[in-house]
Amino acid sequence: MRLESSLRVLNEMEAAGVIGKYAIGGAVAAFLYIEPGTTFDLGAFIALEPGAGGLIDLSPIYDYLRTRGYQPQQEGVLIEEWEVQFLPTGTPLEVEALEQAVAIEIGGTATRIFTQEHLMAICLHVGRPKDLARLVAFAQEGHPDESQLQEILRRHQLEAKWMQFRSRYLSAP
C-alpha cells in the first residue's frame, strides 16, 4: 500500500484550508523510529476548535472527501488504500506533539510526524497493552533523546508513571 498517495490528499486538504496543520502519530509514525509491525490505519492528528456546545465537527472533512470519491470506513475514511483517522488533538500533550512535529518526506511526499519522545509520552499516557509494547520497543530500539523525553514527561506530569513503567518492563532480571 502506498502511503504517499494518502499523504498527498492530506496535503491538498491542508492547502485548501479543510484542515489546519496535521501530523502523523500512532503506529505509522512509530514505525519510522522502531521495527515496523502491523497497522491498518493512518492516524492524522489535527487541531480543531470545538464549535457551539463544545463539540468538534468533522463533517467538513468528510464532506470534502466525499466530493472527491472517498468514503467513510469503520473509524476513518479510506483514502488511496489507507484508512485515515482524523484525530483532533484532545490533550495538552497531543497539542504540543502537533506543534513540535518534525517535517519529513515519505516517498517524495512532504509530511510531518510526531517526535519519538512525544510518541513515547503518548504511549505512556494512553497505556493500552499495544502502547506499552510499543513503548518497550522504543526504549530498546529507538534511541530517544533522554533529556527531551524527561522534559516532556515532567511538563505533562508523567514522571511517576514512567518510573513505574521502567521498573515493571525495562529493569534487568
Please tell me what each predicted stretch does.
Residues 1-173:
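Compositionally biased terminal segments of proteins
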